[in-house]
């Protein structure tokens, strides 16, 4: 085409676009809100939640919570097919009309007494090949409803590197739009809308200087520096306090050594503190990846670790603020994943000597902590004679070491009934044996994720998969959920890529075996703010990044505390009646080939939570 014909072609393009009412420039077209229990995919334009949901009536976000609780919601910004430039979301602190007090006033300290507001951009990971029903869900009948597409996962702080989630962010054109624009003469059809989620954490006050009652604020959406949408925000602060102490446990493993590799500017001690602080703020015990958990007993090492179990590490004086302030970790694993079994506890004499030392230290320094010897991981029948021998060395110990509980990741097995003190089943919990085990001072936990019995731990899981496990724990009186890994940034050694670091921001696959068993997102609930191995993915932050999965783990833990408070007021039966309206069955009451019996909608949990709050009274 000659240059003289370009103006005519351009004019025809403009007229055609105007007739179709399609913008010729990138633009935000709308914004709406949804709770923390949903995942809105990037190209999902048919969600009924857009019109109304548990926190959104079409114009206002309404939240309700307790002192010391963290509330969360998402702002979904819709852009046309051309995308949008320089988009960001800001939250004006909600103000109490009578007192003028504000929740989340800007400024330090983080998670301070008056509350804090944090806003993150949501990073999407594309899944083309779904996780197979191996360890993650029992059968196709229990699979998540949507398993492919651009799934929101990582939550990126505003001060991240430009172009890597830092504010403001550009919403790129849809892939279809890019293809169309390769030919300048092609008429642009109606643009495909796309979503960009922003996550908001609202930390409610820790003290009573902010009065209970209604607080009002606004959420603003900016595009290229101008306001393009406003959403009203109302927060009702109830006159009750969410305990700092957790009455149920999430045990998450995270490797200090691996994390330290990604943050070369930090010392090992700084990397460990970063891991501990971030997990503690989400009401999780990140235990097992420190030197204290993988080494033989060492008095000096345990004295260095002691602040994490007595709570002094989680105080403002130690640099910590937020939920769980002053509360220590509730769990400690001796020799995580069997790391000292064949070293310090390889024969009878050394096992008795080592177990004596551990028991004496904990009884003197941390008597409230549940400590145990992680003897072996996921044993099969061939290891049973070996387990009996090693467990006998502990249980027959004439010294204090006989009180060291023996732990393994296996569902209760009659043949080992006298040998194992704490079980963690990957297929659930033997509910028939649980009362008897507890009466003997033993226990049975559940391990990782297994739909339909409890939530899956894969990227394609619903947001509430990580929330429902706390409800299952309360329903059946299970104390602990153990998740095998939260910082699985290097491929597992059982597979062909064990020597490689993962592209956790772009590749969904995080677990692969030699037999090509796939798992998307397994083992990753925390993400690295630095990426020395793939610099193009580096966010430029010397701290950990959260995820929607991590936030729903916290939401579940907070739900459990509300259940605990409600039980003190109204009794367990009334609490169970509300829980069963959402989670009628779980664990081994559900066959692995059944559909999921519990709700997969965040709204249902929110409405049940509202009823639980009602039991607390005014």
Explain the meaning of each model-derived region.
Residues 75, 219, 373, 473:
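Conserved, mostly hydrophobic/aromatic
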Residues 27-54, 81-201, 206-208:
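Surface-exposed binding patches on compact interaction domains or structured appendages
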Residues 317, 324, 336-347, 351-382, ...:
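Catalytic domains of carbohydrate-active enzymes that cleave complex glycans
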């Amino acid at each position: 085409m000659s240059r003289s014909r370009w103006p005519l072609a351009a004019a025809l393009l403009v007229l055609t676009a105007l007739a179709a009412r399609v913008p010729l420039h990138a633009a935000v077209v709308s914004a709406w809100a949804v709770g923390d229990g949903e995942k809105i995919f990037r190209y999902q334009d048919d969600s009924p939640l857009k019109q109304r949901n548990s926190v959104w009536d079409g114009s206002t976000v309404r939240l309700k919570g307790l002192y010391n609780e963290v509330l969360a919601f998402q702002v979904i910004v819709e852009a046309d097919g051309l995308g949008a430039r320089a988009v960001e979301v800001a939250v004006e602190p909600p103000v109490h009309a009578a007192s003028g007090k504000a929740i989340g006033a800007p400024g330090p300290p983080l998670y301070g007494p008056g509350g804090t507001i944090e806003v993150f951009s949501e990073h999407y990971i594309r899944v083309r090949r779904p996780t197979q029903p191996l360890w993650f869900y029992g059968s196709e009948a229990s699979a998540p409803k949507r398993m492919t597409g651009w799934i929101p996962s990582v939550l990126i702080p505003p001060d991240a590197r430009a172009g890597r989630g830092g504010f403001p962010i550009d919403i790129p054109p849809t892939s279809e739009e890019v293809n169309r624009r390769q030919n300048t003469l092609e008429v642009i059809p109606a643009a495909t809308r796309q979503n960009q989620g922003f996550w908001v954490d609202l930390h409610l006050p820790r003290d009573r200087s902010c009065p209970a009652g209604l607080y009002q604020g606004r959420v603003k959406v900016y595009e290229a520096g101008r306001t393009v949408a406003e959403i009203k925000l109302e927060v009702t602060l109830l006159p009750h306090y969410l305990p700092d102490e957790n009455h149920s446990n999430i045990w998450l493993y995270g490797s200090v050594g691996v994390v330290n590799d990604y943050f070369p500017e930090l010392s090992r001690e700084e990397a460990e503190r970063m891991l501990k602080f971030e997990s503690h703020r989400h009401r999780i015990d990140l235990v097992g990846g420190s030197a204290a958990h993988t080494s033989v007993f060492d008095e000096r090492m345990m004295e260095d670790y002691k602040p994490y179990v007595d709570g002094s590490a989680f105080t403002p004086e130690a640099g910590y603020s937020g939920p769980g302030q002053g509360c220590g970790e509730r769990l400690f694993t001796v020799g995580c994943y069997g790391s000292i079994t064949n070293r310090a506890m390889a024969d009878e004499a050394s096992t008795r000597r080592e177990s004596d030392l551990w028991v004496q230290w904990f009884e003197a320094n941390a008597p409230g902590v549940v400590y145990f010897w992680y003897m072996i991981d996921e044993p099969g029948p061939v290891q049973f004679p070996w387990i009996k021998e090693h467990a006998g060395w502990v249980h027959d110990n004439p010294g204090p070491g006989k009180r060291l509980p023996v732990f393994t990741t296996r569902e209760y097995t009659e043949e080992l009934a006298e040998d194992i003190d704490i079980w963690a089943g990957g297929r659930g919990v033997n509910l028939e044996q649980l009362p008897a085990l507890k009466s003997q001072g033993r226990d049975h936990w559940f391990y990782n994720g297994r739909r339909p019995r409890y939530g899956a731990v894969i990227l394609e899981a619903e947001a509430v998969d990580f929330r429902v496990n706390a409800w299952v724990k309360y329903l059946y009186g299970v104390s602990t959920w153990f998740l095998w890994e939260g910082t699985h940034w290097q491929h597992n050694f059982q597979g062909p890529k064990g020597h490689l670091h993962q592209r956790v921001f772009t590749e969904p696959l995080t677990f692969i075996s030699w037999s090509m068993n796939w798992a998307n997102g397994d083992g990753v609930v925390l993400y690295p703010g630095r990426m020395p191995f793939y610099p193009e993915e580096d966010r430029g932050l010397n701290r950990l990044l959260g995820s929607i999965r991590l936030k729903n783990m916290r939401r579940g833990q907070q739900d459990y505390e509300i259940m605990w408070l409600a039980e003190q007021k109204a009794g367990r039966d009334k609490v169970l009646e509300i829980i069963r309206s959402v989670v009628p069955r779980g664990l081994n009451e559900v066959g692995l080939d059944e559909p999921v019996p519990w709700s997969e909608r965040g709204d249902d949990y929110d409405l049940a939570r509202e009823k639980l709050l009602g039991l607390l009274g005014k």
